[in-house]
Amino acid sequence: MALVAGSAAYQVLRGVTGTFPTQSATLLARAPALCAHTMNRRRMSSSQQTDHLERTANTFRQEIISPAKVCGITNESATVKRVRLAIANREFTFKAGQWVDFFIPGVPKVGGFSICSSPGLLETEGVLELAVKYNLHPPAHWIHSQCALGSEVAIRVGGEFCFDPQPSDLPLDLVLIAGGVGINPLFSILLHVADLHKTREITGRGFQMGNVKLYYCAKNTGELLFKRNILDLVNSFPGKVTCSFHVTQQSSPICRELQPFITEGRITEKDLASYVSTDQLCYICGPPPMIESMCKQLQSLHLPKERILFEKWW
């Protein structure tokens, strides 16, 4: 999951200087889309990489730690479980793109999982969702082996990678680029974009959202999380929400529904060139090598680095 952010963002300069641990930085002006922080180039040891609290020690967190109860569990893919949590504290809020500290009774390690639902779902139904890939790290392993309906946990919101435009902000087009489970915070952003469009259509007020395109790469179509939800958004907002799915190790036939949206192979500069322009804001989440490659390609297309926001995960 996405656990540490490093970025430069629209109207904010905090630097994109490296790869892993965070350092403090200075906010120069408010961005309609963000929170970002500077990172240095020192690589972390394998033991450090497994400690979410260490990695994010200098990252913004809310003060509220809310009890939460598991009220839904589904298999999003063969390796990813989607968990719905009912949030007890009514003052608990988050911004699209943020993550949670995940506290499990009896499990000493604290998990760090990106939220994959929209802030609007929390406001209307009092729930949020996480999508957690299987691994042996204790919090993720607990979700896959012991988590059940009614399980009680506690969560706290953190993260400086978010999309939170205000009604007075200028219209904005987005590019979202995801690799693997890096889709989680970007799916939250995409759902929030849909909510902004709905609010504008119904009330004529609120932030005037521009267009958004999602580029999403995974090993195969089975590992493209939320793909049907994403296609529903594409169909609900024609021209305003578009997507391009990429698969790198597809061995089975691609179903007819997905075929128009699938490209076999990684996301390339040529793929990006068909949509990217210099006035857009780009969010990227995925493995560090992918992010480094995407940043270079976007800058080759003359997208200013201050408009590229990213979050790296392991």
UniProtKB/Swiss-Prot annotation:
Chain ranges of the FAD-binding FR-type domain: 63-166
One Pfam family from the record: NAD_binding_1
Gene Ontology CC annotation, any one: mitochondrion
Example of a GO MF term: oxidoreductase activity
CDD domains referenced in this protein's UniProt entry, alphabetically: FNR_like
Residues that bind NAD(+): G180, V181, G182, I183, N184, P185
Keyword Endoplasmic reticulum: no
Assigned keywords, A-Z: NAD, Oxidoreductase, Signal
EC number(s) stated in the UniProt entry for this protein: 1.-.-.-
Residues making up the signal peptide according to the UniProt record: 1-18
Top-rank taxon, per record: Eukaryota
Protein name: Oxidoreductase NAD-binding domain-containing protein 1
